Amino acid sequence: LVNWSKPVVVLKEPFHLSYPWVFEENEKVYMIPETGQDGSIRLYEATSDSLSSFRLVKKLLEQPKDKEIKMGYGDSSIYKKDGKYYLMTMLQYSEPVNVLELYISDKFEGPYTPHPSSPIIESNKVGRDAGCWLEHQGKLLRVSQDCTHRYGDNVHVSEITKLSPTEYEETILKEKILPTDIPFYKEGGHQFNVINFKGKWIVATDAKEYHRLIGTRIIHKIKSKL
């Protein structure tokens, strides 16, 4: 983790890409980025050992065409337990409220069907994931981004207490884990990922930054032309 290679474009599509969740399954490396603008959840496979290029394998889910969609699939991840694959994702229907949905499949590549407990949550506070599910000290954790007042205000942690083909339950474990008293996190953040690497825990987060001066200059220019 000391030396880093030069950044390269590993995937290019004619729609918005973000939240590049990269993982390994059956000795192959895959990626599920956010592709909600396309109206689908897409699975890509790495085509090089350097992970510098990916190819589309298939669409795991496509948005329902009989419902009004305000915001497409966002921040999707898969978790495997007891031979079942659980896919968690977020949608916004006719109202600006995050709806957390859960799907299940016997196979990694699907088909995925709605879990009996889905939708899990309809909430702007904890209804959108902030990273993949985490296993820590015997607990299964889900991190969520708080969008109550604005996009990515902070991150909460919930413990998933029940997960089976027929049940899902969770409870909030800790709220606002990003320390906003530290200048770096002053404006909040919306992502939290953890990995155990060579016996040590490595945490990746982000932080929001507002360029108020730039916004002020733009407003000034607009007013000066009126």
Task: Describe every region a protein language model picked out.
Residues 1-226:
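Carbohydrate-active catalytic/glycan-binding domains of CAZyme proteins
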